[in-house]
Each structure stands twice: as structure tokens, then as C-alpha cells.
Regions:
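Conserved glycine-rich cofactor-binding loop
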Residues: 13-14
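Substrate-binding pocket helix/loop in short-chain dehydrogenase/reductase
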Residues: 96-97, 101-106
Length: 355
């Protein structure tokens, strides 16, 4: 990657965004950091600079389209032309629908869906005239398969998927060299489960299996540099959720009705008075990880296979070819066997003539 690559990451202060910042910083990118929390943004800035990169801190709410557009303009002025824009910022409410308010649904939608729209429009403003650039969306298995207790977030991710599909189709129609892709994530060990608003009786947790945010960061880095693929799936659980729902949606409804509540909670009563980030950021630098390190996986073999598809297919082809060659060698008669066969054939012919 060339040193001048300019990357914008929303939700950069913590979780997946923070892990993605670290991944791009490791490769020498100049990174514009967008989020609301100033503590986390400053922590991310220090990490970028420690890795030898350049960081531009832009504290703002992605639900504000004017602020996002102004931020993109500033990135172009101070860092240079935007090469990659990653839409990651999100918020959620853990709650049964019957306990939520319309205002809570609106807020989750504004950040988790319209925040992606605002980021995309700001990026396109600069990318389309020069006919280059890449926009990457952080998707989710929940963009295909909704679960109980996260209706607002699931609906926002479904909306994001619909928006993305329209965007990609229009870019293809226009024969644009601006690329876009989406990366669907599994359950991740991020701080969101300790700061998103919750109305659950017990503490919220990601539905196992849980993956570390670095898995997501590596996937987003790869997708940003290989954006021609329509979708990427991270984790076997993501693949199962998406395709299982396509095959048997009614079964999935009943299964999640039985299992989906306990799977999203763990021991310990939730504090109803703890601060949440629905409207304001939670103070402090929370980094990339949540509290589930002891239960989290640091690798996704499914994504590795998907992102190295040519290597996998080549390996399969070589294995099949080698097996066929060995089979041919093992079943092919030796020189001695061929000579003996000719002798037997000649002898049989002589016997028939004599007879």
C-alpha cells in the first residue's frame, strides 16, 4: 500500500472501528477518525501516529449530514483525496419492542442506517468526479436474519443492505470506477455491550460464537483492497445465519424464540442507571475490546477461505491433479507386465491358429 493512501473511518473511537484504524495504521495509511467520543478519538490518534501514520481527528455525529459532508471536505484539504471510506458507526438498544419508544427507534435508525447514507453521499461527492475510490460498509448477519431484543438495530442493518444493493447497481450501470462492497460480521467482542442502552434484566452479550474485533479489522482492510466482490462473510456463524434463514426462515423464527433471549444475556443484573451512548458518547477511551476476551476467537477460517479463494481453488486443483496422476501411475501396468501381456496375447493367437 502506498503511503499516501487516505482512509476515512466512522465509528473510529472504539470496537470494530478502532481495530480497523489499527489495521490501516499498521500499513501506513493517513486516517481521518470520525466518532463522537473525544477520549477514544484521541486514543486512536495516538495509535496511528505511533505506527508512523498521520491522523485527523473529526469529532461529530454521523446522523448530522452537514457535519459529515464538512468533514469529508476537510479530509480532502488536509490529508488529500479520499481513497477509502469505511462506514462503521452504530448504536443500538437491547430491548423487547414493546418496551421501546418511537424516539429510540428513530435514533438507532439515524445513526446505524442514515449514518451510512450520509457517509456514502459525502464520499461520492469527491469520488465520482475523479472516477475512483472505494466505499466499504460494515454489515452484519442481522442484515439477513433478525433476532429478538435488537429490532431497531436489525431493521437498520436490513435498510443498509437495501441501500448498498441499490448503490452498487447504480455504480455498475454508470460504469463507474468507484467501487463498493459490504462485509457481514458475526458476534464481536466490542465495548458496545457495556454502553448501548439496555432494558434487559441481565447484562447483554454477543450471541456466541464471539470473535475478536481484530478479525473484523483484517476483513475490512482486505475488502477495501478487493472491493469487486459483492459481499464478504466473516465467521461460520454468519454464513449459517444468512443461508439458514434463506432455507428455513420459519424454523429460525421458532428456534430464536426459544434460544435467542438467553443467548444474548449472561449472569449479572444490568444496572438500569448506567450511562449509555444512544445520544451522547460514554466518557473514556474504551479501546477495541469488550469484556469477553476469554470467550473470543481471534481468527475466522471461513473468511480466510473466502478471501483467498484463488489459493484454495488452486490447492484443490493441485490436490485433485496429483491424486489423478498417482492413481494413473498406480493402475498403469509396468513394463514387465506389459511385456508379459504381449507374450500371453501372442501365445493365445498361436493356440487359436493351431486349433
Amino acid at each position: 500500500m502506498r503511503k499516501s493512501e487516505v482512509v476515512v473511518i466512522t465509528g473510529a473511537s472504539a470496537g470494530v472501528g478502532r481495530a480497523t484504524v489499527r489495521e490501516f495504521a499498521r500499513h501506513g495509511a493517513s486516517i481521518a477518525l470520525i466518532a463522537r467520543g473525544s477520549d477514544g478519538l484521541e486514543g486512536a490518534r495516538r495509535e496511528v501516529e505511533a505506527a508512523g501514520g498521520k491522523a485527523l481527528v473529526l469529532p461529530l455525529d454521523v446522523a448530522d449530514p452537514a457535519a459529515v459532508e464538512a468533514a469529508a471536505d476537510r479530509v480532502e484539504r488536509e490529508l488529500g483525496p479520499i481513497d477509502i471510506w469505511i462506514n462503521d458507526a452504530m448504536t443500538s438498544v437491547f430491548s423487547p419492542i414493546k418496551k421501546m419508544t418511537g424516539e429510540e427507534f428513530r435514533r438507532v435508525t439515524e445513526v446505524t442506517y442514515l449514518g451510512f447514507v450520509n457517509g456514502t453521499l459525502a464520499a461520492l461527492k469527491h469520488m465520482l468526479p475523479r472516477d475512483r475510490g472505494t466505499i466499504v460498509h460494515v454489515g452484519s448477519a442481522l442484515a439477513y436474519r433478525s433476532i429478538p431484543l435488537q429490532a431497531a438495530y436489525c431493521a437498520a442493518k436490513h435498510a443498509t443492505m437495501g441501500f448498498y444493493a441499490s448503490l452498487r447497481t447504480e455504480l455498475l450501470h454508470d460504469k463507474s470506477h468507484v467501487r463498493t462492497t459490504i462485509v457481514h460480521m458475526p458476534a464481536l467482542n466490542t465495548p458496545q455491550f457495556g454502553w448501548c442502552r439496555s432494558k434487559l434484566p441481565r447484562k447483554a452479550q454477543p450471541v456466541p460464537p464471539i470473535f475478536q474485533p481484530e478479525v473484523a479489522g483484517r476483513a475490512l482492510y482486505h475488502a477495501a483492497h478487493h472491493p469487486n466482490r459483492r459481499e464478504y462473510y466473516v465467521g461460520g456463524s454468519t454464513v449459517k445465519a444468512i443461508f439458514g434463514n434463506k432455507l428455513a426462515p420459519s424454523f429460525a423464527d421458532h428456534y430464536l424464540a426459544r434460544m435467542g433471549y438467553d443467548a444474548q444475556q449472561y449472569d449479572g443484573h444490568e444496572d438500569p442507571n448506567r450511562p449509555d451512548n444512544l445520544y451522547e458518547p460514554v466518557a473514556g477511551d474504551h479501546g477495541a475490546h469488550g469484556v469477553f476476551d476469554d470467550r473470543s476467537r481471534d481468527h475466522s477460517w471461513e473468511f480466510w477461505g473466502e478471501s483467498h479463494l484463488k489459493t484454495v481453488l488452486t490447492g484443490v486443483g493441485v490436490t485433485i491433479g496429483a491424486g489423478a496422476w498417482l492413481w494413473h501411475r498406480c493402475t498403469r501396468p509396468t513394463a514387465a507386465e506389459r511385456a508379459a501381456s504381449k507374450v500371453r496375447s501372442f501365445r493365445n493367437q498361436v493356440v487359436r491358429k493351431v486349433a
